[in-house]
């Protein structure tokens, strides 16, 4: 049935749609199709005969009679057979029907394009042929002529406003101009939208299957007959399988034998195995790329002069920087053959199979992981941050300072031949003692029961009672010194002990220990009865230890290895530290033996300080390094700090806080947090927390000495600018 008849039968009450063809066109089209199918002249129509042609024609006639109930079949237009007419008759018929609608002017949107009768076949078949297929009569459908060259295509692209909406149809071979609706459809598809603009993808969903049990089913379709009748096809398949099993054509699968498999752990290590050869294979290094000197026209600086050429010829082949002489040619055609080509290939072959190769493992490490995660300085307070007081009074370099055990008094020695005593809290100079020479080192006795200060002046060590503080302590100190009873038998000593009398005694001087050479340093033992001095000499008596109560002196070493710079007593154990230019030796005074030898990795040691616990030591040097030693860990530095820009003059530990400081010739004092844990498995924590500046640089000298307050987190520093500064 035709679509029109179906529409009339399905909806008789709706308005009849306007037909695409008139009745005459319909009969004309049917007649043409009928005549063409019955034509005897067409040798090949491209369609197979089917038994439905006649029935279709009869249905068409019945539909025409239904559409034209008032007309008889004789009134229906009959189109004569075109194949039986001559070309002249067909032309005359076309002139007689000027108003007749032509067949190619209208086409259905639902059917295939009637202008192309070749069918939906790949157009690549006729890619190299002049035609695109055959029509219903078997005649070739030639491609339309496309004589446009590139210039015409470009002009058409520039001048034709509809060029952008014109496409080429491969099936018909014609250019088609897209309508606005088609362009809108293409744009919507490119954007990923639906082609139909009226389509709503978000329509409300209707849930057919819910939790509520309905009375009527959703679908009441009856079951198929094949659903309850045994399948004959399956019966035949089963019978074939049974027959094959009986004949022995189908055998059951044999179970696999489970054999024990063992994994070879050393397969990759064996160089004879495939895995081992693959693992041990190292590709050969590539040849270096040629440089400018190997060019046929190198720059002038790569060409050798006559003197350089003679020198190159006189050298041995292994000493030459280049194995050839760079030359210049006008063009590449003038370059002769390379004479060393075979020799270089031979050397390359020797390198490939004679030189061993080594694989270097490249470790990808994040640079952030190499930086230690240190706590923030504000979490490590208290520590000195600002300059609070300036002690002025000296007229020359203040080389040394020391604090009393109570922390109330400060003593300083200067090159102006004076020793001054200061009150820490007010900055007032309480007393000044003028000596015979410049004061190189000074130390306050750590025993809180004595008020005694030792100062190094030229070749003497002077013991001074400043008379400050408690008068009972001052008188007890004088009684301790004057209560000495000389031995019955005099013992030969390397020094001379002399008591001071007269004006010097009233000025505070009590004892004077005269040495044979200039004294550089003095330091007290933790109990205050022993003190050691350093004589800067290459002899055997560089270090002397004095006992105050018995007024005895002794040389603990028969021979000194190197020039001694500093000495220190261990705070709790009978150990004695001796620092030479490059090493720090630790001696046991009871056993009289060398315990350890610390390697400082410095060029010249300037100062040392021992942690109050006694297991760690810091060492400053003139090459701007500060080395921290963990003596329980190693004889090498645990950490080396290079924070200062110039030589370090002094280092010091705090007695109760985890702080240490260093003074340098750059005029700065750097305070660091140095926490030592009781757990031996945990390394010390070292964090620089503050850089203190204030001293002026004078004669290329900055900070000369540094010491901490015994109870407060304060630090004192003396400098070449003749001042002492307190940082709190």
UniProtKB/Swiss-Prot annotation:
The record's SUPFAM superfamilies line, in alphabetical order, gives: WD40 repeat-like (SSF50978)
Q: Does the keyword Nucleus apply?
A: yes
* Biased composition regions of type Acidic residues, renumbered to the chain: 55-67
One GO molecular-function annotation for this sequence?
A: ribonucleoprotein complex binding
Where does it mainly reside?
A: nucleus
Q: Positions of the WD repeats?
A: 393-432, 434-474, 514-556, 559-597, 600-639, 643-682, 698-728
Name the record gives this protein: Ribosome biogenesis protein bop1-A
Species annotation: Xenopus laevis
GN (gene name): bop1-a
């Amino acid at each position: 049935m035709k679509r029109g008849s179906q529409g009339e039968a399905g909806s008789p009450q709706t308005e009849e749609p306007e037909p695409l063809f008139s009745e005459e066109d319909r009969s004309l089209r049917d007649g043409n199709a009928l005549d063409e199918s019955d034509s005897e002249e067409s040798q090949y129509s491209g369609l197979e005969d089917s038994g439905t042609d006649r029935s279709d024609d009869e249905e068409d006639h019945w539909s025409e009679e239904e559409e034209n109930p008032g007309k008889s079949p004789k009134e229906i237009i009959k189109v004569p057979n075109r194949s039986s007419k001559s070309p002249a008759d067909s032309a005359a018929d076309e002139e007689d029907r000027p108003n007749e609608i032509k067949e190619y002017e209208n086409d259905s949107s639902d059917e295939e394009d009637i202008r192309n009768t070749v069918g939906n076949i790949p157009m690549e078949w006729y890619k190299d042929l002049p035609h695109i297929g055959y029509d219903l009569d078997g005649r070739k459908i030639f491609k339309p002529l496309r004589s446009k060259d590139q210039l015409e295509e470009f002009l058409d692209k520039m001048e034709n406003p509809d060029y952008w909406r014109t496409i080429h149809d491969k099936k018909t071979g014609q250019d088609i101009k897209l309508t606005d609706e088609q362009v809108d459809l293409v744009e919507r598809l490119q954007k990923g939208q639906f082609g139909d603009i009226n389509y709503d993808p978000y329509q409300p969903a209707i849930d057919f299957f819910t939790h509520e049990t309905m009375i009527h089913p959703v679908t009441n379709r009856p079951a198929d007959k094949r659903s309850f009748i045994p399948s004959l096809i399956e019966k035949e398949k089963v019978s074939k399988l049974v027959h094959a099993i009986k004949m022995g054509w189908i055998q059951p699968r044999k179970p696999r034998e489970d054999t024990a498999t063992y994994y070879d752990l050393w397969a990759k290590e064996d160089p004879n195995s495939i895995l081992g050869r693959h693992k041990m294979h190292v590709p050969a290094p590539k040849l270096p790329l040629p440089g400018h000197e190997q060019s046929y026209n190198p720059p002038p600086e790569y060409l050798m002069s006559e003197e350089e050429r003679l020198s190159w010829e006189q050298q041995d082949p292994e000493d030459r920087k280049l194995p050839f002489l760079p030359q210049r040619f006008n063009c590449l055609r003038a370059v002769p053959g390379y004479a060393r080509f075979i020799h270089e290939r031979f050397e390359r072959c020797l390198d490939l199979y004679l030189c061993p190769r080594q694989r270097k493992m490249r470790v990808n490490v994040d640079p952030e992981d190499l930086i230690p995660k240190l706590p923030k300085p504000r979490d490590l307070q208290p520590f000195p941050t600002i300059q609070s007081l300036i002690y002025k009074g000296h007229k020359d370099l203040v080389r040394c300072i020391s604090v009393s055990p109570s922390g109330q008094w400060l003593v300083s020695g200067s090159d102006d031949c004076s020793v001054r005593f200061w009150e820490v809290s007010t900055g007032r100079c309480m007393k000044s003692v003028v000596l015979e020479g410049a004061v190189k080192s000074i130390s306050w006795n750590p025993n809180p029961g004595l008020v005694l200060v030792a100062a190094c002046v030229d070749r003497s060590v002077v013991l001074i009672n400043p008379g400050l503080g408690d008068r009972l302590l001052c008188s007890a100190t004088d009684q301790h010194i004057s209560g000495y009873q000389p031995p019955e038998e005099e013992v030969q000593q390397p020094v001379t002990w002399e008591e001071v009398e007269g004006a010097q005694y009233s000025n505070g001087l009590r004892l004077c220990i005269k040495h044979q050479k200039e004294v550089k340093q003095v330091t007290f033992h933790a109990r205050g009865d022993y003190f050691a001095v350093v004589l800067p000499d290459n002899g055997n008596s560089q270090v002397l230890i004095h006992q105050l109560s018995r007024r005895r002196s002794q040389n603990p070493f028969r021979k000194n290895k190197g020039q001694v710079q500093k000495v220190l007593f261990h705070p709790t154990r009978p150990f004695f530290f001796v620092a030479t230019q490059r090493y720090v030796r630790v001696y046991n005074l009871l056993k009289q033996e060398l315990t350890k030898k610390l390697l400082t990795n410095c060029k010249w040691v300037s100062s040392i300080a021992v942690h109050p616990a006694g297991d760690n030591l810091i060492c400053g040097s003139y090459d701007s390094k500060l080395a921290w030693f963990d003596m329980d860990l190693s004889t090498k530095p645990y950490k080396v700090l290079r924070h200062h820009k110039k030589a370090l003059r002094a280092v010091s530990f705090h007695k109760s806080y985890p702080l240490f400081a260093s003074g340098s010739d750059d005029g700065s004092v750097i305070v660091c947090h140095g926490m030592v844990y009781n757990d031996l498995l945990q390394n010390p924590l070292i964090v620089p927390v503050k850089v203190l500046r204030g001293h002026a640089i004078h004669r290329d000298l900055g900070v000369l000495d540094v010491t901490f307050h015994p109870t407060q987190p304060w630090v004192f520093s003396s400098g070449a600018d003749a001042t002492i500064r307190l940082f709190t």
